[in-house]
Amino acid sequence: MKASKTGMPKRRNARKSDLTRFINTSLVDLVAKQIRSMIFAGDYLPGEKLVVRELSEVLGVSHTPVKDALNRLVAEELVEAIPNKSMVVKSFTNNELVERLGVRLMCELFYAGEIIRSAKEDDTLVSDLEACLTAMEEAICDDSNIDYEAWVSNETRFHRRYMTAAKNQTLVSVYNGLNTNEFTFFAYLHNEHKPLKRPIFENNLVEHRAIIDALKALDQARFVRAIAWHVLHACEDYNVDEEAQLRIEQIKRLAECHLDGLGEPSQKIS
C-alpha cells in the first residue's frame, strides 16, 4: 500500500476522513434535535430570532454544527431564513391554518369511503392507529415533562396512516404537504406564547378514539362525523377574526353537505 508523505497509508487517511464526517453529522443531528425540542417546548417562540452564538453557548458546541442544524430546520419548515438578516422560528398565521384545515377535511371527506373499504380488508389499519394513540397518551403522561414533539409526531402518523389507506399516492402527497398537525401546534404557540394545555390534549385523545371506533365499526357516516368534528374543533381555537369565522363556516357547510350525501339529511356539525 502506498504511503503518504507523513507515512500514513492513504486508505487510513480516507477512513479517518470518513469518521470525521460521521462525527460531524452525528453532532449536527444532536444539535438539530435539541433546538427542535426547545422550539416545540416554547423556549423559542414563532417569530423569535435564533442567534448562532447564543445557541452555541447554550448547547456547548461550536458555531458550525449550530449553523448546519438551523439549515436542516429550515428544510423542515420549523425555522425561516430571512434574507440578509437572520434565522427566526417560523410563524404560522391563523388564516393559513384554517385554509389548510379546510383542504385537509376535503381530502378526508371525499376519500372516507375508500378508507372504510380498506379498513374492512386490512386489519393492520386499526391496530396501527391504536399504536399511535398509545404513543400520544405516553407523550403526555407526565405533566411535568410533556413530550410535545412526540405528541405532534404521533398525531401526524395517526392521520397519515388512515389516509394511505385511500390508496392514492397523489392524495397522500398533497395531504402530507399540508402538515396540519404541526401547523396547528405552532399556530397555538404563536397565539398563546405557550404550548397546548392538558385539556386540549385530553379532548384530542377522545376525538382520535372516536375515529378509531368508527373505523372498527366500518361505519362511514360515523367516520365522517368523527373526522369533521375533529377538524372543526381544531378550527375553533383559531376563530379570532371575521375572515377566520367565514372560512370555518364554509368548512362546516362542506361537512354537512357530505353527510347529506350519505343519506343523513339535516346533519349539523356544531
Q: Model regions: which residues?
A:
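Short, flexible helix-adjacent loops and helix caps
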Residues: 40-44, 112-120, 141-145, 187-194, ...
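Amphipathic alpha-helical repeat elements characteristic of tetratricopeptide repeat
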Residues: 29, 105, 130, 202-206
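Residue-level recognition of hydrophobic positions within alpha-helical transmembrane segments
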Residues: 64, 100, 104, 151, ...
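A short, ordered amphipathic alpha-helix with a cationic face
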Residues: 74-75, 100, 147-150, 197-200
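C-terminal all-alpha effector/ligand-binding and dimerization domain
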Residues: 23, 187-270
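Conserved amphipathic alpha-helical segments that form helical-bundle/coiled-coil interaction surfaces
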Residues: 95, 122-192, 207-210, 214, ...
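Short linear motifs at protein or domain termini
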Residues: 1-118, 170, 243-270
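Short helix-coil transition/hinge motifs at the ends and kinks of transmembrane helices
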Residues: 11-18, 123-124, 141-147, 190-199, ...
